[in-house]
């Protein structure tokens, strides 16, 4: 059973529409569907809501610590409510998936994502669920003929808003992810993963 859903991003209006905040977009949508309001909760270092989702009580969290300190917020809430790593789902932007893709998985490395790296360090575990929301990679924007030796600026890419066509694809992937949330929250995470991946995400 999933008891805590965390969306990763950076705080502040200047980051709201940037690719790195894709995790926030998903949690915002979940809060809207539940009729819940995310409020600043200092003890959890983020915006927090306790929501009733699909018949289950679920904690929603958007850390306001900046991405590379996300673990501080996650561990504070997890310890307070005695939530195990395997009961946590972290939604985050994923460079290695194209816009329009979303994948669910348990455990694994950080893939260079500083938010995941910090969460794993604070939880002393990598065994939490990740919802990877594809944003594409800046190398994909470089013509193939010019890719040899090119060094794409990843930091600049994730801190910029997606193009309109990319945003539409990302929104569609988030909708598909939301459609399997009832299954995941009730503890049928493997089934939710199969449904999401089968639906072309």
Curated annotation (Swiss-Prot):
A cellular component term, taken from the record's GO annotations: cytoplasm
Annotated site location: Discriminates between blocked and unblocked aminoacyl-tRNA: 10
Database matches in Gene3D superfamilies: Peptidyl-tRNA hydrolase
Keyword Nucleotide-binding: no
Keywords assigned by UniProt, alphabetized: Cytoplasm, Hydrolase, RNA-binding, tRNA-binding
Binding site for tRNA: 15, 66, 68, 114
Keyword Cytoplasm: yes
Assembly and binders: Monomer.
Family assignment from sequence similarity: Belongs to the PTH family.
Protein name: Peptidyl-tRNA hydrolase
Taxonomic source organism: Burkholderia pseudomallei (strain K96243)
């Amino acid at each position: 059973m999933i008891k805590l859903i965390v969306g990763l991003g950076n705080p502040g209006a200047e980051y709201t529409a940037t690719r790195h905040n894709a995790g926030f977009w998903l949690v915002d949508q979940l809060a809207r569907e539940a009729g819940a309001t995310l409020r600043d909760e200092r003890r959890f270092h983020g915006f927090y809501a306790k929501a009733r989702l699909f018949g289950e009580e679920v904690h929603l969290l958007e850390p306001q610590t900046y991405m590379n300190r996300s673990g501080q917020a996650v561990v504070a809430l997890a310890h307070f409510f005695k939530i195990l790593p395997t009961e946590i789902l972290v939604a985050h932007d994923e460079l290695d998936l194209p816009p329009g893709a979303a994948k669910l998985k348990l455990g694994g490395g950080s893939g260079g994502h500083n938010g995941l790296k910090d969460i794993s360090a604070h939880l002393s575990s990598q065994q939490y669920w990740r919802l990877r929301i594809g944003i594409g990679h800046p190398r994909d924007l470089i013509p193939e003929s010019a890719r040899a030796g090119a060094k794409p600026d990843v930091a600049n890419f994730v801190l910029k808003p997606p193009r309109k066509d990319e945003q539409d694809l990302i929104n569609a992937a988030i909708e598909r992810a939301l459609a399997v949330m009832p299954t995941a929250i009730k503890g049928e995470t493997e089934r939710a993963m199969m449904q999401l991946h089968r639906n072309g995400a």
